[in-house]
UniProtKB/Swiss-Prot annotation:
GO molecular function, one term: serine-type endopeptidase inhibitor activity
Top-level taxon of origin: Eukaryota
InterPro entries: Kunitz_BPTI (IPR002223), Kunitz_BPTI_sf (IPR036880), Prtase_inh_Kunz-CS (IPR020901), TFPI/VKTCI-like (IPR050098)
S-S pairs: C6-C62, C21-C45, C37-C58
Site feature (Reactive bond for trypsin) residues: R22, G23
Function of the protein: Serine protease inhibitor. This peptide can inhibit, in-vivo, acrosin and, to a lower level, plasma kallikrein. It probably plays a role in Drosophila reproduction.
Keyword annotations from UniProtKB, A to Z: Disulfide bond, Protease inhibitor, Serine protease inhibitor
Gene from which this protein is expressed: PapD
SUPFAM superfamilies per record: BPTI-like
Protein name: Male accessory gland serine protease inhibitor
Domain BPTI/Kunitz inhibitor, residue spans: 6-62
Species for this entry: Drosophila funebris
Amino acid sequence: FKNPECGEPHSLDGSPNGISCRGYFPSWSYNPDAQQCVSFVYGGCGGNNNRFGSQNECEERCI
């Protein structure tokens, strides 16, 4: 991986459906299986470093 955070699991926030808190932050995460950045909604809790503010930022860090 270009950077370690890109190898972390898809960034979610602790809930099976991906949203466990009341925040609504459109975000991007690198999906190592698909080898591409994908969009998701971050709820504001938990998660990991595989979370980026834009597709461009994700691609610059991970692709």
